[in-house]
Swiss-Prot record:
The gene is nsmce1. GO terms for molecular function: protein dimerization activity; ubiquitin protein ligase activity; ubiquitin-protein transferase activity; zinc ion binding. It holds the Pfam family zf-RING-like. It is an enzyme of class 2 (transferase). It comes from the Eukaryota. This is Non-structural maintenance of chromosomes element 1 homolog. Keywords: Chromosome, DNA damage, DNA recombination, DNA repair, Metal-binding, Nucleus, Telomere, Transferase, Ubl conjugation pathway, Zinc, Zinc-finger. RING-type zinc finger-containing E3 ubiquitin ligase that assembles with melanoma antigen protein (MAGE) to catalyze the direct transfer of ubiquitin from E2 ubiquitin-conjugating enzyme to a specific substrate. Within MAGE-RING ubiquitin ligase complex, MAGE stimulates and specifies ubiquitin ligase activity likely through recruitment and/or stabilization of the E2 ubiquitin-conjugating enzyme at the E3:substrate complex. Involved in maintenance of genome integrity, DNA damage response and DNA repair. Belongs to the NSE1 family. Transmembrane segments: none annotated. Its EC number is 2.3.2.27.
Length: 270
């Protein structure tokens, strides 16, 4: 495929920007639609080349289209990532200062949690801790709905975790801000919000990474220390269709207690 950008690339980029993040099957359909609409030769196996052309043109703007895997469903996603504004300031045009502060504190609750979730009650209680303008509980509830709609958070059964878009766009921020506590998957080396931890050495694995790594192994052992893996191996089909359950993301009891104590101390010192 030629390295020159054309109308099909431009339309593809506009659609991706308007969605913020798109699942792989939708991106493949968009690729075909853009090529056919602008009468550009379409090849179903050339999506990576198509995106590569865009990325070469986006590079001087410090932007790139990245591919990631959703922790909730194990599916592939594409998102446009700004390499300069790789922290929460990129949200400043959409949210007020106190709303951004609430989002930062919500992220911290999720990242420091044992299972990658924060309850709605714990987030509502943050309204009284804001250093900027205080918020009413009703305002926090409405703001959480906005974060979910804009694909910064995922809400389920009164609990919240980070959306794939948030993890992809703010990965560098998470690594830099929480470098001592942020979990990094031992298999894919990406930030792991929901994960399983080794009972012995404490290394984390994404659920889908654990499922792939241990697939077909009768006696799974930790990829780092070779000790027996203490968790139920995630069913990749179940993760993809339903998302992970809390039992899948929970660590062993002893590790959980140590992490909980560390998290409490960290929050107290902040």
């Amino acid at each position: 495929m030629a390295d020159r950008i054309n109308e099909s690339h431009q339309r593809f980029l506009q659609a991706l920007m308007s969605h913020g993040i798109m699942e792989g099957s939708a991106v493949r359909a968009l690729h075909r639609h853009c090529c056919e609409l602008h009468k550009v030769h379409y090849m179903h196996d050339k999506l990576d080349d198509f995106v590569g052309v865009l990325n070469r043109h986006l590079q001087p703007l410090f932007m790139t289209i990245e591919k990631g895997v959703g922790e909730e469903d194990g599916l592939t996603y594409y998102a446009l990532v700004n390499r300069v504004e790789n922290d929460i300031t990129k949200m400043a045009s959409d949210y007020a200062e106190n709303e951004l502060e609430l989002f930062r504190k919500t992220m911290e609750l999720i990242i420091l949690s044992d299972n990658g979730f924060a309850t709605s009650i714990s987030i509502l209680n943050l309204a009284d801790e804001l250093q900027s303008k205080k918020m009413k509980k009703k305002e926090v509830e409405q703001l959480l709905q906005s974060f979910v709609q804009e694909k910064w958070l995922i809400g389920r059964n009164g609990e919240y975790t980070l959306h794939t878009r948030c993890i992809m766009e703010l990965e560098h921020y998470i690594r830099n801000t929480y470098q001592d506590v942020a979990k990094i998957c031992n298999v894919c080396r990406k930030v792991a919000i929901q994960s399983q931890l080794c009972e012995n050495c404490g290394i984390p694995l994404h659920l889908q990474c654990a499922g792939k790594y241990f697939h077909g192994k009768a006696n799974p052992t930790c990829p780092n220390c070779n000790e027996s893996w203490p968790h139920e191996i995630p069913d990749l089909n179940q993760v993809s269709s339903q998302g992970p359950s809390h039992s899948q993301t929970e660590t062993v009891r002893g590790r959980n207690q140590r992490s909980k104590n560390t998290s409490t101390a960290s929050r107290t010192s902040r």
